């Protein structure tokens, strides 16, 4: 979702922009972003776009009240390895997200990546919808 937000050419750019804006304004739950996601996203932007785009995203993440960067503890890393081994369709970074979600008892992930769909206990959201609003 963060990559789509930063790439105007991405098919999901407008939707990602709406999700990020809603998070920034407090209309969505605070989005926890693991250090793996930050690393993966910044590296991608640095290599495929421009360094300044990667820096802009980092600054947005740490300054936004709608996002909370979190460090993945060793236990999550170990759980991510197990999830990665068990799920051939799940990238390691996604497995790390799921491990964090399981530890924190978080059900929802904002993502355009349907690799999360088969994971039990994870509900993927791809619109600026607050799952806790009636």
What function would you assign to each model-found segment?
Residues 1, 36, 95-96:
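Active-site phosphate/pyrophosphate-handling residues
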Residues 1-32, 46-56, 133:
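Short, well-structured N-terminal submotif of metal-dependent ribonuclease cores
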Residues 3, 42-43, 81:
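Amphipathic alpha-helical segments within well-ordered protein domains
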Residues 34-40:
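Short, conserved active-site loops that position catalytic residues or coordinate cofactors/metal ions
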Residues 38, 104-134:
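Acidic, PIN/NYN-like endoribonuclease modules and their adjacent C-terminal/linker elements
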Residues 43-70:
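Helix-adjacent hinge/juxtasegments
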Residues 48-51, 87-88, 125-129:
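Short, hinge-like loop/turn segments at secondary-structure boundaries
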Residues 69-107:
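Active-site neighborhoods of divalent-metal-dependent phosphate/nucleic-acid chemistry enzymes
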């Amino acid at each position: 979702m963060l990559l789509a937000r930063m790439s105007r050419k991405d098919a999901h750019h407008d939707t990602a922009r709406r999700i990020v804006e809603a998070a920034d304004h407090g209309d969505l739950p605070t989005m926890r972003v693991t250090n793996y996601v930050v690393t993966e996203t910044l590296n991608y932007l640095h290599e495929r776009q421009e360094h300044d785009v990667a820096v802009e995203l980092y600054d947005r993440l740490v300054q936004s009240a709608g996002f909370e960067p979190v460090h993945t503890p060793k236990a999550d890393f170990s759980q991510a390895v197990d999830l990665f081994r068990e799920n051939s369709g799940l990238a390691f970074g996604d497995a790390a997200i799921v491990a964090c979600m399981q530890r924190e008892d978080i059900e929802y992930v904002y993502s355009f990546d349907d690799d999360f769909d088969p994971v039990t206990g994870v509900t993927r959201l791809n619109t600026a919808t607050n799952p806790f609003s009636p």
